[in-house]
């Protein structure tokens, strides 16, 4: 690798503010904020709104869309355009 052109890879503390969960991940993210972690070391700190701790796909708390109601509503509104009158 060419020296001097790659961003610094380091551990960063991410804070999922929606569920108040902290985790450390390796990243090249640049931030001026820092936080002291549980191991006593100081790491760069970054807040996020969604992570695997809060995203519906990973938590299993997905919102179910009522497809039948939407389809029925569509068919009711546009049924007249589908009928062929001779």
Swiss-Prot record:
GO biological process: translation
Highest taxon of the lineage: Bacteria
GO cellular component, one term: ribosome
Keyword terms: Ribonucleoprotein, Ribosomal protein
GO molecular function (one): structural constituent of ribosome
Gene3D superfamilies per the UniProt record, alphabetical: Ribosomal protein L31 (4.10.830.30)
SUPFAM superfamilies, alphabetized: L28p-like (SSF143800)
PANTHER family, alphabetized: 50S RIBOSOMAL PROTEIN L31, CHLOROPLASTIC, LARGE RIBOSOMAL SUBUNIT PROTEIN BL31C
Subunit: Part of the 50S ribosomal subunit.
Family statement drawn from the similarity comment of this UniProt entry: Belongs to the bacterial ribosomal protein bL31 family. Type B subfamily.
HAMAP family attached to this UniProt entry: Ribosomal_bL31_2
UniProt protein name: Large ribosomal subunit protein bL31B
Protein's gene: rpmE2
């Amino acid at each position: 690798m060419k020296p001097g052109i790659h961003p610094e890879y380091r551990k960063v503390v991410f804070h999922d503010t929606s569920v108040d969960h902290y985790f450390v991940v390796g990243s090249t993210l640049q931030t001026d904020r820092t936080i002291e972690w549980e191991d006593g070391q100081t790491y760069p700190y970054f807040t996020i709104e969604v992570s695997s701790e809060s995203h519906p796909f990973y938590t299993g708390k997905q919102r179910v869309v009522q497809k039948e109601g939407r389809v029925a509503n569509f068919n009711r509104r546009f049924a007249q355009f589908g009928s062929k009158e001779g």
